[in-house]
Amino acid sequence: MKTLTSAQVRQMFLDFFKEKGHAVEPSASLIPHEDPSLLWINSGVATLKKYFDGRVVPENPRICNAQKSIRTNDIENVGKTARHHTFFEMLGNFSIGDYFKEEAIEWAWEFLTDQKWIGFDPERLSVTVHPEDDEAYELWSKKIGIPEERIIRLEGNFWDIGEGPSGPNTEIFYDRGEDYGNDPSDPELYPGGENERYLEVWNLVFSEFNHNPDGTYTPLPKKNIDTGMGLERMVSVIQDAKTNYDTDLFMPIIKATEAISGEKYGTSAEKDTAFKVVADHIRTAAFAVGDGALPSNEGRGYVIRRLLRRAVRYAKSININRPFMYELVPVVADIMAAFYGEVKEKADFIAKVIKTEEERFHETLHEGLAILSEVIQKEKAKGNRIISGEDVFKLYDTYGFPVELTEEYAEDEGMEVDHEGFEREMDKQRERARQARQDVGSMQVQGGALRDIMTESEFIGYSDIKTETKIAELLQDGELVDLVQEGQKVQFILEKTPFYAESGGQIGDKGWVKSGDAAIRVTDVKKAPNGQHLHEGIVESGAIKKGMSVTAEVTERLRKDIVKNHTATHLLHQALKDVLGTHVNQAGSLVTDSRLRFDFSHFGQVTKEELEQIETKVNEKIWASIPVQIDLKPIAEAKAMGAMALFGEKYGDIVRVVQVGDYSIELCGGCHVRNTAEIGLFKIVSESGIGAGTRRIEAVTGQGAYEEMNAKLELLEQAAEVLKTNVKEVPKRIEALQSDLKDAQRENESLLAKLGNKEAGEILEKVKEIDGIKLLAEKVNAKDMNHLRTMVDDLKAKLGSAVIVLGAVQNEKVNISAGVTKDLIERGFHAGKLVKQVAEACGGGGGGRPDMAQAGGKQPERLAEALASAEEWVKSVL
């Protein structure tokens, strides 16, 4: 057998099938496109469903690929077994109605055994087939010549990944030899059994059926071939590696982790698990973030968050207690650069996202673990083995512990978690969120007469804001009527309308519909269930009848402000990509007459300097007086032009393309200015985070921007008046006041230190001696934890050799600090353990180093009793 690198194996596979007339399909993004049945691309065939189910005919019916994939159904096993992964590569060859079983089997055998290619010893290969697949059995037996004892019929040889193609399959196994198993009594020691000797290297699926969304199976238009070879497993065989992790796909990551941790891979099972978890999870996170997924509390983002936090948890067992995963991104990029250049191209961005997520978790990890430890001890004391759903939810909601992470920590302590209770708490949170949201009168809940209205209505509002028309339908309280009187609310549909209906983030128009003395003030416009523009308003005068001729007019001032904000939103979207990076994508928007709001994907806060750059770029495009061109185009042509489409948005064959010069091009159905100069001015008023990986910018344009800047100038003038200076001197005046304040604070701290030293001197008289160990455990007056730690340090210096624990009450909360001198640390005394015991005795928790530690408590009335427990603790150490 040849010695090959993973990159050589991957390329060799593609080259082989290229020689067999296959087109090489590029690896698709891990984020599925138009496939709601999948969270991630989880196989090579998952990206080719459109070909297999007959929706699209490929240019070449023979296809091969190397497809990056993610599966998360058994994360808890990753790191603990030889071959479980969350990220992996699947090599595959596919036939869309071209060749079938005979060629698939012959070529698989050729690739594996021919010396030009992999060059396996044929005697080491066995195969499995479905019990009813006699054709495959005969091909292996008679065409290839495999002895019957190495052809095993297995009931499980039927491949099904959910919605999509499926059918019987045959698997090829490599015998690694007796070193990996030689017990004839082992019931699993056979190709297809659970063992390490016979490794599956290739799965050939004879795809004949489509698994429909309703669970039924129907014959595919043509018989197809779908094969899958796991690159990691294949490489482990070729490189004679004990596990997949001992190959060149993982070892550089493990070596880098060794350098960070100071620990060695291969010294213990526990440490090896940690190294494997880190190596697997950084591959997944790097590729997922590179493809546009960001850490969050739901969907794909939750998977990334869970994996990174699981890696942090395991890294602690190899002495890594700081953010470090981001340092491994360049290692992953180098390993995969030959075929997946995207990780190397986006390495800085990926590392920044991962570092931000790690830092966020480390901020709460220590406190969360203390709470979890407290919960576990509390339940154990009660004789319980289950952590309540309420406690699991608190750790999830407050400290960012994915429930699966809590479960793993609990498992280490012989505990379980209450999943049902956790889900109940999650449901309560979702309900609270639903109740907190404003009722926006969603069209989805409207029914009755509206659903049955099929009357046609033409929208002319792109070009006209006023028109003569007729009232086609009248509704009141959801029912069709013929007449609505003055003072009553009304809904109506016009034969043609200039009023824009709320969609794409743009609000509906306001205005008037009049006929003689009768008038309706239009307050909102939405789309009815069958697509007509449904106007809502109040009859301000006269009576409105169905069929009457009316004049419909949009309020021009409001429409003009709306279009300014909408075009500015497009400019903002592109400016964000220019300044922050191409990873930025729209996550939501709101365009009103008074302001615009734009939500976008980004991993961290946008800096002041970045906001200034973004604002400047938008204004430069406004002042450049760029024409805005709007065209209807076939969607393929629009995308070829580079038009940005909203992820998940459904588009027809013909789309509306809004183009601002050569700067911005988007698919959009909204209303826009004709030239950017009409916008006048753009001003960002706020930037904030609205969820993990999602930021929000609010901005104003035109007159609104002018008023915003005037309001800020007025505030500055008021500040100058209060500071008794002019506007230009305000910063200097504030700096002078800050300097005076710092001087006063230093003087105050000096006085407090003197008082603290005085108190510290007084409590020296309260030192106890226990079998030669000096102990000082007292309640003191300290303004905060820093003050308390300073007192402990001073007392350690004065006493020379002592165990010290001090407590103070501030705003009904307890602060505790403990210190142990170096000589007593060597005798087994540990400040972190002492402070933990004292804190738990007054309803809190904490910890720290052997020489210095701190904690908090919630029951100030028990502080004296808690401090008294220090004496027993000292005796227990002795």
From Swiss-Prot:
Molecular function GO terms recorded: alanine-tRNA ligase activity; aminoacyl-tRNA deacylase activity; ATP binding; catalytic activity, acting on a protein; transferase activity; tRNA binding; zinc ion binding
Domain of life the protein comes from: Bacteria
Record key words, sorted: Aminoacyl-tRNA synthetase, ATP-binding, Cytoplasm, Ligase, Metal-binding, Nucleotide-binding, Protein biosynthesis, RNA-binding, tRNA-binding, Zinc
A single GO BP: alanyl-tRNA aminoacylation
Cofactor binding note from Swiss-Prot or TrEMBL: Binds 1 zinc ion per subunit.
Reactions catalysed: tRNA(Ala) + L-alanine + ATP = L-alanyl-tRNA(Ala) + AMP + diphosphate
GO CC, alphabetical: cytosol
InterPro entries per record: aa-tRNA-synth_II/BPL/LPL, Ala-tRNA-lgiase_IIc, Ala-tRNA-ligase_IIc_anticod-bd, Ala-tRNA-synth_IIc_core, Ala-tRNA-synth_IIc_N, Ala-tRNA_ligase, Ala_tRNA_ligase_euk/bac, DHHA1_dom
Subcellular location: Cytoplasm
Cofactor or coenzyme needed: Zn(2+)
Pfam families: DHHA1, tRNA-synt_2c, tRNA_SAD
Catalytic EC class: ligase
Gene3D superfamilies: 2.40.30.130, 3.10.310.40, 3.30.54.20, 6.10.250.550, Bira Bifunctional Protein, Domain 2, Threonyl-trna Synthetase, Chain A, domain 2
Transmembrane segments annotated in the record for this chain: none
EC number in record: 6.1.1.7
Residue sites binding Zn(2+) per the record: 566, 570, 668, 672
Domain notes per entry: Consists of three domains; the N-terminal catalytic domain, the editing domain and the C-terminal C-Ala domain. The editing domain removes incorrectly charged amino acids, while the C-Ala domain, along with tRNA(Ala), serves as a bridge to cooperatively bring together the editing and aminoacylation centers thus stimulating deacylation of misacylated tRNAs.
Family indicated by similarity: Belongs to the class-II aminoacyl-tRNA synthetase family.
NCBIfam families: alaS
Function, in words: Catalyzes the attachment of alanine to tRNA(Ala) in a two-step reaction: alanine is first activated by ATP to form Ala-AMP and then transferred to the acceptor end of tRNA(Ala). Also edits incorrectly charged Ser-tRNA(Ala) and Gly-tRNA(Ala) via its editing domain.
Protein's name in the database: Alanine--tRNA ligase
Annotated source species: Bacillus licheniformis (strain ATCC 14580 / DSM 13 / JCM 2505 / CCUG 7422 / NBRC 12200 / NCIMB 9375 / NCTC 10341 / NRRL NRS-1264 / Gibson 46)
